[in-house]
Amino acid sequence: QSISEQIKAFANEQGFSVEIYQSNHEGDIIDLIHKSKDEYDGVIINAGAYTHYSYAIRDAIEAVSDYTPFVEVHMSDIHKREDFRKISVITPVCVKQICGFGKDSYKMGIDLLLKIL
């Protein structure tokens, strides 16, 4: 079972559904973040390498954060990696950062969103 399938199954067990979106295009991610205000109760975001330098994604999250909570997740512990990976420009505009728990980072993000919502 893929990580996406496991996340969907876990969310369904908790009584709600999830949409999973992946893109290598920063503008597409920003468009989805802007849409989240009207379409999603909460968002779990793993911004990959964009985590470390995309002020555009950070600004998009900040613009909708009054309407939609964002939880930042990473499978690896970014704080135990190379120096440039220890920096997250999106953490300040997210409710919380969860990292270092492998695929369980996503489940922990779902649990946190359930508590917030």
Provide a role label for each language-model segment.
Residues 48-51, 76-78:
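Short glycine-rich anion-binding loops that position phosphate/pyrophosphate groups of nucleotides
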Residues 17-27:
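Short beta->alpha junction loops
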Residues 84-103:
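Short beta-strand elements at the ligand-binding edges of bilobed clamshell
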Residues 63-80:
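Short, acidic/small-residue loops that bind anionic groups at enzyme active sites
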Residues 36-43:
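Short acidic/histidine-rich motifs immediately flanking catalytic phosphotransfer sites
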Residues 35, 54-65:
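Short Gly/Thr/Asp-enriched flexible loops that form oxyanion-binding sites at enzyme active sites
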Residues 99-117:
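A charged, well-structured terminal subsegment
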Residues 1-12:
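Short catalytic helix/loop segments, enriched in acidic residues and glycine
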